[in-house]
Amino acid sequence: SQVTGRASEDVVLFVGTGATSAVAKLVSALGLAGPLPPGWKPNDRPVIFVGPFEHHSNLLPWRESCGEVVTIGENSSGGLDLAELEEQLRRFASRKLKIGSFCAASNVTGGLEDVDRVTATLHRAGALALWDYATAAPYVHV
């Protein structure tokens, strides 16, 4: 919380080898690397919500995990479609582990995401909010 100015339950992962390594480390730490563990049913799978402009560093580790990846589209302003995110959070409400993993700024469009609003939406649904600041960090207060 001293670094981010956020709540004490927030975490920042500093990994010197880039965003790909950070996401892969997180996937492993959450026990989600590889196929669905024995005895798990398909509905036991965690669900990972990603945005329309994610860099492969945020996509590939999740696609290689046992989680189900759901892509949220863009709204008319070019940002993440919060209405669609809310709809998908309701659709997957029964999943024990829900994760939103998004870039704070798109390296495709340069657009900044409303991190606080998206995070609040995820938290209201009991989901984790994960943010890749690789593109945004030089331009925003972290």
Identify the function of each model-found stretch.
Residues 1-142:
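Pyridoxal 5′-phosphate
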